[in-house]
Amino acid sequence: MDEAPNQGLNVKIDDEELKGRYSNLLRITHTREEFILDFINLVPPQGIVTSRIVTSPGHLKRIIRALAANLERYEQLFGVIQEAPDPAGDGSVH
């Protein structure tokens, strides 16, 4: 996965997806064949999954590389991001 969109790729997005989804929590689970990323909007005492991404382990590694590169560029431009404390829980939420 490249950080820059492929110039030959035409990507369409419908109006509903264009709005985006808010998430302040991420739950990650996996099987041998896939990773499941549940993006959650947590408003205690309830959390609502706003988006679920299912992807292969190989593609997830490319996503992580692209995120790390973009995070590094962001911090070079705007300064180091202070990490938020981990939420209390059983460790399944990241």
Which residue ranges define each predicted feature?
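Positively charged, low-complexity terminal tracts
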Residues: M1-H94
